């Protein structure tokens, strides 16, 4: 299961550390906005005027307000994916 978190955790952590605003779309279509205060395996703590604990299983999409750059720790994964895109 840790392999499934190899992209999710660095992505959410970058959004949290850089205090990037996000729109979080839930599976029922509701849009939440704010900044990621914290997260763990099951929930994201989203801060706007109040803090909301959002369960990850209810999330469809996380959209940052600006492009972000992830740490290049997964550089070899990107190299493996490159030939498939050609």
UniProtKB/Swiss-Prot annotation:
<dbReference type="GO" id="GO:0005829">
    <property type="term" value="C:cytosol"/>
</dbReference>
<dbReference type="InterPro" id="IPR005001">
    <property type="entry name" value="Hfq"/>
</dbReference>
<comment type="similarity">
    <text>Belongs to the Hfq family.</text>
</comment>
<dbReference type="GO" id="GO:0045974">
    <property type="term" value="P:regulation of translation, ncRNA-mediated"/>
</dbReference>
<dbReference type="Pfam" id="PF17209">
    <property type="entry name" value="Hfq"/>
</dbReference>
<feature type="domain" description="Sm">
    <location>
        <begin position="9"/>
        <end position="68"/>
    </location>
</feature>
<dbReference type="InterPro" id="IPR010920">
    <property type="entry name" value="LSM_dom_sf"/>
</dbReference>
<comment type="function">
    <text>RNA chaperone that binds small regulatory RNA (sRNAs) and mRNAs to facilitate mRNA translational regulation in response to envelope stress, environmental stress and changes in metabolite concentrations. Also binds with high specificity to tRNAs.</text>
</comment>
<dbReference type="GO" id="GO:0043487">
    <property type="term" value="P:regulation of RNA stability"/>
</dbReference>
<keyword id="KW-0694">RNA-binding</keyword>
<dbReference type="GO" id="GO:0003723">
    <property type="term" value="F:RNA binding"/>
</dbReference>
<dbReference type="InterPro" id="IPR047575">
    <property type="entry name" value="Sm"/>
</dbReference>
<dbReference type="GO" id="GO:0006355">
    <property type="term" value="P:regulation of DNA-templated transcription"/>
</dbReference>
<protein>
    <recommendedName>
        <fullName>RNA-binding protein Hfq</fullName>
    </recommendedName>
</protein>
<comment type="subunit">
    <text>Homohexamer.</text>
</comment>
<keyword id="KW-0346">Stress response</keyword>
